[in-house]
Amino acid sequence: MKKLISAVVSLIIIIAIGAAAYEAYLKKPSADALTEPIVIGNGMTTAQIADVLKKSGVISSNAIFTAVADLTGRFNEFHAGTFIFKEGMSAFDALKTLSVQGQTEISVTIPEGFGLKDIADRLVQNKIIGSDADLFKVTGEPAKTANIDATLLKDYPFLADKPTNASLEGYLFPDTYRFYAPTDAETVVRRMLDDYAAKVAVLSPAPDYPTLILASLVEREVKDPADRAKVADILNRRIAAGMPLQLDSTVNYATGKNLASVSSDDLNVDSLWNTYKYPGLPPTPICSPGLDSINAALTPTPNNYLYFLTTPDGTVIYSQTLEEHNAAKAEYLK
């Protein structure tokens, strides 16, 4: 009987040691399940860190985590910072993660009037994403048709207003955001769509897709908020009269350039976004408009002008006739 009891106890000990070794070193995390960012503060003890990690689903045993930290001396290598873990990690792998410098949260400002290319460049510059292509996989590319993920469309009902093959141009709301470097592009896009939902989709009335396009044109064409509602009215009346909008900003969007004065070759570029060549609104917005421009597009100010130009210093010159407009161009755009 004593031998049997001894054998059972030995077996239990072996199983316990095996389980502990598995939890400590061999356990594999979930391939896809990532935690929310976890902050490890200066001065936190091993026990406190273990408690935070267990509550977040990173580890399953505080005791094993603490024991491995003590045995390996890893506690002396911990960094304070913000970390993202995989759920269900071994204690050893969690400790290795903590020995690497934590992620840095970076403040990134997306100004009003930025297009998808500008936004992608700004995110790459701040090491939030690796390349422009990372963002475009989620949003589609500027001045091209796109195939947006169905789950994303379902999660943001206001996107149902856009054409099926349109990119997310215009929907990434201009604001100041805080992202961890790096952050996957879909997370970035969702954060910006959340901002649009909170600040634009709640307007009464909310802008429909043509209004969002109009707002983006106003945003790129004029700088002073006082001019935007007046210009919105001019553009609406030009469309109603069958007149081409003839906006340099749309040509720049089609060519990917940012020229103060577009070339004759650019004016002839065969793109649906070229409003010199094709009448009406372009197929998509050409940038992310701010609230001032959106409100201007929603409530244009009636006026008698059909033409306008913006001088190099941002002043808007209005004209009622083509002759007046040509004279203004000769005077102000020398």
PLM features: what roles do these ranges have?
Residues 22-199:
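Signal peptide-directed extracytoplasmic domains
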Residues 1-35:
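N-terminal type II signal-anchor transmembrane helix
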Residues 2, 42-47, 67-71, 266-271, ...:
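A broad, low-specificity signal for short, low-complexity segments enriched in glycine/proline
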Residues 13-17, 33-46, 111-114, 245-262:
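Short N-terminal secondary-structure initiator segments
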Residues 5-7, 35-37, 76, 232, ...:
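Short low-complexity stretches enriched in small and charged residues
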Residues 59, 128-129, 142-334:
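Bacterial extracytoplasmic/cell-wall-associated proteins, especially those involved in peptidoglycan
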